């Protein structure tokens, strides 16, 4: 959609996700243009990674890149368990989108599962074979379980 491309030309993915007005605007664009059954909030499953202490970037042509990936127990221990307040931008985008939708269609939200978040955090981005994830899982089970627990608490908090 042209209006989406215009916003993307001015703002990064993270900027669109972290700015409630922009995220709500992107959420509403398809609803305002097409007769759809529901709206999906514009966000990304990796948003919790930054406030937890990981450096996240959406590199052009590469997708998400974590510049300080989790590789061992010490890295897991450094990750903060954040509360909902750390992602107020998403909650505010949801409020704004719901207000603008005014009941026309339902608003769908989503979150990344602990394994998915861990895989990105460990691999440093997307992966085809998840070798580093498997390595941590099998060679450092204590670190793996602690990481799963942290991500589970973050996405349910």
Which stretches of residues belong to each language-model region?
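N-terminal basic, low-complexity leaders that serve as flexible interaction/assembly modules and, when applicable
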Residues: 1-60
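Active-site-proximal, glycine-rich beta->alpha crossover segments in alpha/beta enzymes
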Residues: 57-157
């Amino acid at each position: 959609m042209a209006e989406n491309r215009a916003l993307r030309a001015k703002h990064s993915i993270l900027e669109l996700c972290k700015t409630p007005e922009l995220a709500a605007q992107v959420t509403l664009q398809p609803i305002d243009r097409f007769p759809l059954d529901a709206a999906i909030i514009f966000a990304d499953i990796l948003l919790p990674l930054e406030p937890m202490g990981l450096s996240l970037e959406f590199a052009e042509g590469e997708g998400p890149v974590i510049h300080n990936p989790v590789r061992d127990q010490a890295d897991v221990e450094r990750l903060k368990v954040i509360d909902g307040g750390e992602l107020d931008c998403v909650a505010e985008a949801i409020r704004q989108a719901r207000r603008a939708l005014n009941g026309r269609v339902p608003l769908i939200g989503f979150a990344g599962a602990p394994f998915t978040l861990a895989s990105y955090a460990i691999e440093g981005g997307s992966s085809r074979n998840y070798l580093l994830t498997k390595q941590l899982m099998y060679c450092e089970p204590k670190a793996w379980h602690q990481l799963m627990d942290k991500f589970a608490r973050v996405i349910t908090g």
